Design a protein with these regions (language model features):
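General beta-strand structural signal in soluble alpha/beta enzymes
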Residues: 4, 35-37, 50, 59, ...
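Active-site beta->alpha loop and helix N-cap motifs at the rims of alpha/beta catalytic domains
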Residues: 1-46
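Acidic (Asp/Glu)-rich catalytic clusters
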Residues: 22-29, 51-52, 87-91
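Catalytic alpha/beta core domains of metabolic enzymes, predominantly
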Residues: 47, 55-182
């Protein structure tokens, strides 16, 4: 797949994001295209709409487990919308959810250093991996069970988590910290 992003200035504008994503899909018109839509609150309806129209989407800028859950729900609901509109074969709809890793530790580490206790400092570099592990458990839950099985029977693909921003920003950490921990 190749990903092309909607204009980032539209991240807080549902209607224009949807219009831009649709226009990119129609302009490029390639089966291996994923249009990037930011995982903002305003992006969630666009994700659902595009998936419901049978278009492949790369959801970007996911920084929290709660938002990741909302992104997966938008994807699954979009697949259900596709079925409700008469699409019987869902196998051509693909999506990834780009969950950003290192930026979480960058922010949390800064706050832990402000606290400055030994206990706080011992937690540096651990939040992002822990959050990704929790997110993965939600992935397992979302893409199993009767609701998912009904979609999978029509060829639906899981929305794969994409661990993004896996290079460390802190020079004290191994360059492969996140890759090593998440494999």
């Amino acid at each position: 797949f190749v990903s092309v992003e909607v204009d980032p200035a539209l991240a807080r504008d549902t209607d224009r994001t949807t219009t831009d994503a649709r226009a990119l899909h129609e302009l490029i018109n390639a089966p291996n295209l994923m249009v990037k839509i930011p995982g903002t609150l305003e992006g969630l309806p666009s994700i659902r709409t595009m998936i419901g129209e049978g278009r492949s989407i790369n959801v970007t800028l996911i920084f929290s487990v709660s938002r990741y859950i909302e992104v997966m729900e938008s994807y699954v609901a979009g697949l259900e919308d596709a079925v409700a509109s008469g699409q019987e074969d869902l196998s051509d709809i693909a999506s990834v959810a780009s969950f950003f890793i290192s930026r979480t530790d960058t922010e949390v580490d800064r706050r832990l250093e402000e606290i400055g206790t030994d206990q706080a400092l011992d937690l540096r570099g651990k939040t992002a991996v822990a959050q990704a592990q929790v997110a993965y458990q939600h992935f397992i839950t979302t893409f199993s069970g009767p609701r998912w099985d009904a979609l999978a029977a029509k060829g639906a693909q899981v929305q794969r988590p994409l661990w993004a921003s896996t290079s460390t920003k802190n020079p004290r950490y191994s360059e492969t910290l996140y890759v090593d921990e998440l494999i």
